[in-house]
Amino acid sequence: MNDLDVALRAADAADAVSLAGFTERSFVVEHKADASEVTAIDRATEEAITAVLRTAFPDDAIVGEEFGRIGPATARREWYVDPIDGTSNFVRGVPVWGSLIGLVVDGMPVTGVVSAPALGRRWWATHGAPAHLNGRVIRASDTASLDRAFASISVTQSWRDAGRGPALESLTRHVARVRNYGDFWQHMLVAEGALDVSIDAIGLKPYDIAALVPIVAAAGAAWSDRFGAPQWRGDTIVCANPHLHAAVIAQLTA
């Protein structure tokens, strides 16, 4: 069984736990030290993913949002797991949340699965193969100018705190339409070609990004940190079709 097959099996295990919890709504909401929300469903979902990965690849490292790192610090192969990306949506009954499972080999994300069972959508890709949504090949858009672009932008205090609020707001005036779909979904919509640009909040962690990169790249879109570097360990991710990415970064860094 190859890496992608195992990641898809892990996503199946995650969906079984998370969707049941979302539907039953019997969880208690707790708060972490950083005030972010978490439930027992987050932890149980990460455990379900980890069990599949550990069984298939016992020598690999796993880095999860809820339980941290399992396995050797020097492992060439690392799985980055966000069991429920969009917990704030999950706890409020908003169906935009999903499990992120990304494989990093020698420091580069090569396989990614994003599963959003409440939306009935799953995206995946592995290096050298097309990106898929529910078994259908997807491609980024070919919109060639910012003034015709549809963008999803997470306009948050984090951008203002970084001194980039005015630059982000300027960008909103240069595109055709702006929405905030948030979290993983906006980047998957760029991979699908439904959106042209997606800009996340500042303050992300590697487990928020690792699974996204292979899918966005395999769909023919461009991705980077907010400075334009192909750095998935940065504090945010910016995605766009290849015609627009440089222009977006130019606006953000102006």
Predicted regions and their residues:
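Short acidic/glycine-enriched loop/turn segments that link adjacent beta-strands
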Residues: 35, 119, 231-233
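An extended, acidic
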Residues: 140-254
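Short loop/edge segments at beta-strand edges and connector loops
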Residues: 64-66, 135, 182
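DPxDG-like acidic metal-binding loop motif
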Residues: 73-132
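A structural micro-motif
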Residues: 27, 60, 129, 175-176, ...
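N-terminal subdomain of lithium-sensitive/metallo-dependent phosphomonoesterases centered on the IMPase/IPPase/PAP
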Residues: 1-84, 244, 249-250
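Residue-level signal for inorganic ion chemistry
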Residues: 14, 18, 42, 53, ...
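A structural micro-motif at secondary-structure boundaries
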Residues: 132-140
